[in-house]
């Protein structure tokens, strides 16, 4: 049975047969729920703790 994965950027659960799998040169596997998460992490190098729409967001200052 396929397992439910978790997005490497926002922390959202990814249902089976959906999402994007990215494999780095060192062999580590990253799962993304959307192209928005993939671009934010890999291309734009954003910190998920600073974005309100992620589960790891830290509010306040």
UniProtKB/Swiss-Prot annotation:
Instruction: Report any Pfam family annotated for this entry.
Output: Ribosomal_L24e
* An annotated GO cellular component: ribosome
User: Which of this chain's residues are annotated to bind Zn(2+)?
Assistant: 7, 10, 33, 37
Name one molecular function that GO assigns to this entry: rRNA binding
Listed InterPro entries: L24e/L24_sf, Ribosomal_eL24, Ribosomal_eL24-rel_arc, Ribosomal_eL24-rel_N, Ribosomal_eL24_CS, TRASH_dom
State the free-text cofactor note: Binds 1 zinc ion per subunit.
- Give the protein's cofactors: Zn(2+)
Q: Which UniProt keywords apply?
A: Metal-binding, Ribonucleoprotein, Ribosomal protein, RNA-binding, rRNA-binding, Zinc, Zinc-finger
- The C4-type zinc-finger regions cover 7-37
Family named by the database record:
Belongs to the eukaryotic ribosomal protein eL24 family.
Q: Relate the assembly described in the record.
A: Part of the 50S ribosomal subunit. Forms a cluster with proteins L3 and L14.
Please describe what this protein does.
Binds to the 23S rRNA.
NCBIfam families attached to this UniProt entry: PRK14891.1-1
Protein name listed in UniProt = Large ribosomal subunit protein eL24
- Taxonomic placement: Archaea, Thermoproteota, Thermoprotei, Sulfolobales, Sulfolobaceae
């Amino acid at each position: 049975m396929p397992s439910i994965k978790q997005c490497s950027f926002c922390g959202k659960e990814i249902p089976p047969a959906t999402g994007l799998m990215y494999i780095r040169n060192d062999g580590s596997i990253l799962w993304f729920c959307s192209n928005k998460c993939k671009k934010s992490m890999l291309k734009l190098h954003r910190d998920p703790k600073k974005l309100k729409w992620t589960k790891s967001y830290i509010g306040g200052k």
